[in-house]
């Protein structure tokens, strides 16, 4: 493999032996994030023969490197390093201890040896024991998605016929660090081969050097102008709104309850109290209408008599005052005011029960043993079954959500846009100074369209007046690289970008450090 100033690593299979010269080939991994870690073990040292520390990733490759001198195979320094490819884990460890709880994954490993293993669903399916004379100290472990390859100190120690991204990796260690984590993405590369061996690499990473070399399939250029095209990777998106704020009224579901005129009395016990008008809330906003209760008389809890709702801190008259539930169900029943509510809650027929009198006949039977055949005054019982939560809210009126819109225009780069409902990609420039003296009429007074119907110029109300913006194509068909003295020195473009210099009817952008790396 080839390393490029810690910014990339390049792998190629030993069977890949092209003729001398430049060749476009995969296998390059560009570093996109670097972090370090000093230690992750407790005061007693790290645990060997086990995976105890892991960091989550979603990457084509992850390299974990120790300082140049490496780390010793001991509980005082290095214990375990691993690569997680989601379906299986590859790890390297050592374990010379014996006894209960020691070496939980590998079992006892001979002294002065290390173990390279692969595990799937808790079962080891690959084991390789290597003497430490081959790897005197731990220096690096790299996980690569291509054929799920794992490299220990630069040597390929595991591969399979699957290609999967790295989902997690980590080094469990006590001292000898720090460990440097390098997260990489896969890119194509233009490699220079001599006698079947790669001597230099140029990444096709969207940089000026990469665009020029990978488009022309060579790293050697004579002086001149080189037209090029590139597809812009759009990373940003903005929206231009017609309104500064928008009100959205969310749906309020109404549950209306009414008196049941033909309800039959219970015949003894709470299980014979028939339920009516059961309504169950799902998620959202609800209004429960109990207006018919105005002709009923609420009966407070009095030992066995009346209502029973210690788990509900509200009355039915106030249930719509913004209470949160998850879930909520309400039913009506007609039963004895004497004991009907309390016994229903004890029997888990409801969380809370509210009793109301309508001066009904004494036709309802008792609910307690010994009173099942006795007659008591019938009343209206309202059963509420609920748990507190965040999916259901009661309200007296619909909920209105106000969204405040801010027009933040992204300039001088290719972006995805949504301008007054029209979407597309473009390179946005501010043309207020050029347009201010003209009378621009627009699509509803806000935009000018070109012949294709796409937005050409649009206007936004700013703090100090109207601002005009022009939408240009993301790709400049007139752009050219400038090579002088064998070096990439600049770009000619028709766009007036930040830092550019006017040159006749075009603009020149100087490239700093545009020299291609020398071949090794």
From Swiss-Prot:
PTM note: Specific enzymatic cleavages in vivo yield mature proteins. The precursor is processed into S1 and S2 by host cell furin or furin-like protease to yield the mature S1 and S2 proteins. The cleavage site between S1 and S2 requires the optimal sequence [KR]-X-[KR]-R. Cleavage is not necessary for virus-cell fusion.
Entry keyword annotation includes Glycoprotein: yes
UniProt keyword terms in alphabetical order: Cleavage on pair of basic residues, Fusion of virus membrane with host endosomal membrane, Fusion of virus membrane with host membrane, Glycoprotein, Host membrane, Host-virus interaction, Membrane, Viral attachment to host cell, Viral envelope protein, Viral penetration into host cytoplasm, Virion, Virulence, Virus endocytosis by host, Virus entry into host cell
Extracellular side: 1-520
Keyword Glycoprotein: yes
UniProt record, GO biological process: endocytosis involved in viral entry into host cell; fusion of virus membrane with host endosome membrane; virion attachment to host cell
GO cellular-component term (any): host cell endoplasmic reticulum-Golgi intermediate compartment membrane
Residue positions with a glycan: 5, 33, 56, 84, 127, 146, 161, 195, 220, 230, 247, 254, 259, 289, 408, 430, 496, 513
Known partners and oligomeric status: Homotrimer; each monomer consists of a S1 and a S2 subunit. The resulting peplomers protrude from the virus surface as spikes.
Family: Belongs to the coronaviruses spike protein family.
Function recorded in the entry: S1 attaches the virion to the cell membrane by interacting with cell receptors, initiating the infection.
Name of the molecule in the record: Spike glycoprotein
């Amino acid at each position: 493999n080839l390393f490029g100033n810690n910014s990339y690593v390049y792998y190629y299979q030993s069977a890949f032996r092209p003729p001398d010269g430049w060749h476009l080939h995969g296998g390059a991994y560009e570093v996109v994030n670097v972090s370090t870690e000093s230690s992750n073990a407790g005061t007693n040292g790290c645990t060997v023969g086990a995976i105890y520390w892991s960091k989550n990733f979603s990457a084509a490759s992850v390299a974990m490197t120790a300082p140049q001198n490496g780390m010793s195979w001991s509980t005082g320094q290095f214990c375990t390093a691993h690569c997680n490819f989601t379906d299986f884990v590859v790890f390297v460890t050592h374990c010379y201890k014996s006894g209960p709880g020691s070496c939980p994954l590998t079992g006892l490993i001979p002294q002065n040896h290390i173990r390279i293993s692969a595990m799937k669903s808790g079962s080891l399916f690959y084991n390789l024991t290597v003497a430490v004379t081959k790897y005197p100290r731990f220096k690096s472990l790299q996980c690569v998605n291509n054929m799920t390859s794992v490299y220990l100190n630069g040597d390929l120690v595991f591969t399979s016929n699957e290609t999967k991204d790295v989902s997690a990796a980590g080094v469990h260690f006590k001292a000898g660090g720090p460990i440097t984590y390098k997260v990489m993405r896969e890119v194509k590369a233009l490699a220079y081969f001599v006698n079947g061996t790669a001597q230099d690499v140029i990444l096709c990473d969207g940089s000026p050097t990469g665009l020029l070399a990978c488009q022309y399939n060579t790293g050697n250029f004579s002086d001149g102008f080189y037209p090029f095209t590139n597809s812009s990777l759009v990373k940003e998106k903005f929206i231009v709104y017609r309104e500064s704020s928008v009100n959205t009224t969310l749906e309020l579901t109404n549950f209306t309850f009414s008196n049941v005129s033909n309800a039959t009395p219970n015949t003894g016990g709470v299980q014979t109290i028939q339920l009516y008008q059961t309504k169950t809330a799902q998620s959202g906003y609800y209004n429960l209408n109990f207006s018919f209760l105005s002709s009923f008389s609420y009966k407070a809890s009095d030992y066995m008599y009346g209502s029973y709702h210690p788990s509900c801190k509200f009355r039915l008259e106030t249930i719509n005052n913004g209470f949160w539930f998850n879930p909520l169900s309400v039913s009506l029943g007609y039963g004895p005011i004497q004991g009907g509510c309390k016994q229903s809650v004890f029997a888990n027929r409801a969380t809370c029960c509210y009793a109301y009198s309508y001066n009904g006949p004494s036709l309802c039977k008792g609910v307690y043993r010994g009173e099942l055949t006795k007659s008591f005054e019938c009343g209206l019982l309202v059963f509420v079954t609920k748990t507190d939560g965040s999916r259901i809210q009661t309200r007296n009126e619909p909920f209105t959500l106000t969204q405040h819109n801010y027009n933040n225009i992204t300039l001088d780069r290719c972006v995805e846009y949504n301008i007054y409902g029209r979407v597309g990609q473009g390179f946005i420039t501010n043309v207020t100074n050029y347009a201010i003296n003209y009378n621009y009429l627009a699509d509803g007074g806000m935009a000018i369209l070109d012949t294709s119907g796409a937005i050409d110029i649009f206007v936004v109300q700013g703090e100090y007046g109207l601002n005009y913006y022009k939408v240009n194509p993301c790709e400049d068909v007139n752009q050219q690289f400038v090579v002088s003295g064998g070096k990439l020195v600049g770009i000619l473009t028709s766009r007036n970008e930040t830092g550019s210099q006017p040159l006749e009817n075009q603009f020149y952008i100087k490239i700093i450090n545009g020299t291609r790396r020398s071949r090794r």
